[in-house]
Structures are given as structure tokens and as C-alpha cells.
């Protein structure tokens, strides 16, 4: 399973790391996703949820 929020769809993003000489090398920024137990179709399930979804109350832990 990919590290992607099942509620908001947040996932890692890619871009460039820039050195002092402005040389570019590829890098990724990981989304702040936590593995939590939530109710999915009335049953508890462990899924990845973003910290923003947890803070805003879009999902509740079981």
C-alpha cells in the first residue's frame, strides 16, 4: 500500500534539491501521513491518514 492519505489523497511530492552552485538533483518530500485505525464501512481498519485530516476532525480514531 502506498503512503497516501485515504481521506484527502495527500501523497509524497517530487522536486529538485539545489546545492549552493544551483546543481539540481531529484528528491521527494513525504506527506505527513500516520497509520491509524478508523472505521471503514463500519469495521475498524488500519489505514494511512494525513495529519491535517486528523487535526481537522475529518476522521476519528477507533
UniProtKB/Swiss-Prot annotation:
Residues 14-26 have a biased composition (Polar residues). GO terms for molecular function: structural constituent of ribosome. One of its GO terms (biological process) is translation. SUPFAM superfamilies: L28p-like. It comes from the Bacteria. Keywords: Ribonucleoprotein, Ribosomal protein. InterPro entries: Bacterial_rp_bL28, Ribosomal_bL28, Ribosomal_bL28/bL31-like_sf, Ribosomal_bL28_bact-type, Ribosomal_bL28_sf. Belongs to the bacterial ribosomal protein bL28 family. This is Large ribosomal subunit protein bL28. It comes from Bacillus licheniformis (strain ATCC 14580 / DSM 13 / JCM 2505 / CCUG 7422 / NBRC 12200 / NCIMB 9375 / NCTC 10341 / NRRL NRS-1264 / Gibson 46). The lineage of its organism: Bacteria, Bacillati, Bacillota, Bacilli, Bacillales. The gene is rpmB.
